[in-house]
């Protein structure tokens, strides 16, 4: 059996959730402001509870990336896609979605596209994921390190789109 082509993008999506969930757990204020602007419940404890759930799903997906993990990651990104899409359609006054627990970029088309792509990737992974990925990676070249590298690069590029450090530096 070969490693599915969607493995690196899925692991990148899960890794981004680790960072985002951890950041929101640590700094929930910007996410709470975004939820408040949308007219949704926005208490800091509620944001932290959601961030903890996000972090649990993400860590489980990195540690044991099977079909269930893919379905859970897809559900998280589908919720993000719905939130950002609704914010754009309704013109909610959100200056930052708070994805990474601090002011980053305004929700926009790149943000929506990445969330939707991560939803598709995670859904695809849920459909094709092997139950024991370690059995696939052990005989592969360098035990999957090239795959981990590609996942890290994809995650880093997506993080740059979501947080736009150049825009923040110009402020």
Region roles according to the model:
Residues 1-171:
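Membrane-interfacial helix-loop segments of redox and metal-homeostasis proteins
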């Amino acid at each position: 059996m070969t490693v599915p082509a969607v493995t690196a993008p899925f692991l990148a999506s899960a890794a981004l959730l680790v960072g985002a969930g951890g950041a929101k757990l640590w700094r929930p204020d910007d996410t709470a402001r975004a939820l408040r602007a949308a007219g949704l419940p926005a208490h800091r404890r509620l944001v932290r509870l959601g961030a903890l759930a996000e972090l649990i799903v993400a860590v489980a997906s990195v540690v044991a990336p099977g079909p269930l993990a893919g379905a859970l990651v897809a559900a998280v990104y589908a919720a993000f896609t719905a939130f950002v899409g609704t914010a754009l359609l309704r013109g909610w006054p959100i200056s930052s979605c708070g994805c990474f627990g601090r002011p980053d970029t305004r929700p926009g088309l790149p943000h929506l596209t990445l969330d939707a792509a991560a939803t598709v990737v995670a859904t695809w992974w849920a459909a094709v994921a092997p139950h024991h990925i370690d059995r696939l990676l052990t005989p592969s070249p360098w035990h999957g390190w090239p795959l981990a590298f590609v996942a890290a690069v994809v995650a880093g590029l997506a993080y740059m789109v979501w947080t736009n450090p150049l825009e923040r530096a110009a402020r």
